[in-house]
Amino acid sequence: MKTNSEELTVFVQVVESGSFSRAAEQLAMANSAVSRIVKRLEEKLGVNLLNRTTRQLSLTEEGAQYFRRAQRILQEMAAAETEMLAVHEIPQGVLRVDSAMPMVLHLLAPLATKFNERYPHIRLSLVSSEGYINLIERKVDIALRAGELDDSGLRARHLFDSRFRVIASPEYLAKHGTPQSAEELAGHQCLGFTEPGSLNTWAVLDAQGNPYKISPHFTASSGEILRSLCLSGCGIACLSDFLVDNDIAEGKLIPLLAEQTSDKTHPFNAVYYSDKAVNLRLRVFLDFLVEELGNNLCG
């Protein structure tokens, strides 16, 4: 008996989802049907593909080898089908996009109308999360994140690079004075992140050339909240340029310690599961973001 594409699809979905129940939900199948198909596949192959416990699933050595091949086969099948249909296909359907709130407000929302005019049959669903998420569990097609890619199960498309700006409002500086060095920040009300703590080591360099670690007077979980605190005169913040450049241009915020601030950039990427790469609505959205953000954000 030969293995069929349904068996490959179900097996790969079980592994990527981490459970039979989540795979069944993703595939719109009964739990019993998913379990039965995987068992049938194991019987055909004559090996156990999964270690089953009451708490979690894990791949056997044979299962890991088979999963890699099955995943590639399904990707090639989907790519071949998409290529045949792409000539006549119109991008359509719901595209679920997750990003931190500052990116939603300052990058995605301003581009939504232009994207809708170009692709009127795609319905964007924008949700906000500050940390890393499980795309499958959250039913998200694509996430926009800062930093390097850690999860080998994901693919990334580079969108743009950003630099940090140390900024404060004119009102704050008029009241508290303007720091002339990283060390002088110790005498000011610095605005920092609740977590991760690494974001409270700023890009401004001290006399020894080391990034300066602040002791925050106020903390918040989002860069957007810190921006609001900064605009209201609560203190000094260090935020990504795309978040504050308009405020600087309008005179609402003043850049500080420019000569002591590192010009090192940090990347922003779109991340998604590799089997989504052939999804036409995802592909055109990625191309759109690269075109718009790559051209308009110079870091």
Swiss-Prot record:
HTH lysR-type domain sequence ranges: 1-60
Which superkingdom? Answer: Bacteria
Question: What inducers act on this gene?
Answer: Expression is transiently induced upon contact with target cells. Negatively autoregulated.
Query: One biological-process term from Gene Ontology?
Result: DNA-templated transcription
Q: Which PANTHER family match?
A: HTH-TYPE TRANSCRIPTIONAL REGULATOR, TRANSCRIPTIONAL REGULATORY PROTEIN
Could you describe the subunit structure of this protein?
Forms oligomers. Oligomerization is required for DNA binding.
Q: What is the designated name of this protein?
A: HTH-type transcriptional regulator CrgA
